[in-house]
């Protein structure tokens, strides 16, 4: 298999990055890496995931330019306990098996909670998804964010101004 997948994914080995689970080299993180991250506690509480949990890196702002702050874009995960909501919407909630990228339990990727976090919130590297494991996450985000060109507002002369 080629080290670069159809969605631009490259394994850590292909990038020359060691696979140490110790403190991650935040400079070397890339889409498809699974990290342990500390998500902020929200006051007042909402529906967002919070606390210490695994997350999949899905975006590196430095690919577009120099960001104001050192952040990464991630999809938080939760433990798969056979929740019906995830079974009803598998494209929105891709599942990963126990052991995938060193996950301790079967997990659900919460695409509806994609967000930026400060790089200092990344507390450890767990592993890297292969292209087949990352594909449902990539495709789901692409469709959800209308990256395929669907649902993009047409420019009118009023809005062009």
Give the ranges of each region predicted by the language model.
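Conserved functional hotspots at enzyme active or ligand-binding sites that engage polyanionic ligands
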Residues: 1-161
């Amino acid at each position: 298999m080629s080290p670069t997948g159809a969605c631009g994914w490259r394994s850590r080995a292909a990038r020359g990055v060691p696979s140490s689970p110790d403190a991650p080299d935040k400079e070397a993180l890339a889409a498809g890496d699974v990290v342990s991250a500390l998500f902020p506690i929200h006051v007042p509480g909402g529906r967002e995931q919070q606390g210490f949990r695994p997350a999949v890196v899905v975006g590196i702002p430095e690919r577009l330019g120099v960001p104001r702050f050192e952040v990464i874009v991630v999809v938080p995960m939760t433990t798969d306990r056979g929740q019906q909501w995830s079974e009803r919407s598998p494209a929105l909630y891709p599942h990963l098996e126990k052991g995938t990228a060193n996950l301790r339990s079967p997990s659900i990727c919460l695409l509806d909670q994609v967000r930026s976090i400060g790089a200092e919130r990344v507390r450890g590297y767990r592993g890297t998804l292969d292209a087949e494991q990352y594909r449902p996450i990539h495709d789901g985000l692409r469709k959800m964010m209308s990256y395929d060109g669907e649902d993009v507002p047409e420019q009118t002369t009023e809005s062009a101004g």
